[in-house]
Amino acid sequence: MNKTNGKMNAIYMSDLAQAYFPKSTPRSASAQLHRWIKLNDELQRRLEELHYKPRQRALTPLQHGVIVECLGEPGE
């Protein structure tokens, strides 16, 4: 997670997607992460509760945390 002075900052969806799919192009990685979100009912529900929109470019710290909680840390 991006942290500055102990505070968590927003993270771009493309950066998170690249962390999960480092061998993919940014566009392909983003498409795959969106696919994973769409296929995971619990993750999709929890993100919707946090006002996530499918094509938003930046994630709030809470949205980012939910994705990592449901999918695991990138690289695991």
Stretches found by the model and what they are:
Residues 7-24:
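Polyanion-binding surface elements
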Residues 1-7:
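Positively charged, polyanion-binding regions of nucleic-acid-associated proteins
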Residues 23-58:
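Major-groove DNA-recognition helix of helix-turn-helix-type DNA-binding domains
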Residues 15, 32, 63:
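Ca2+-coordinating acidic residues in Ca2+-binding motifs
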Residues 57-76:
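A short, Lys/Arg-enriched interface patch at domain edges and termini
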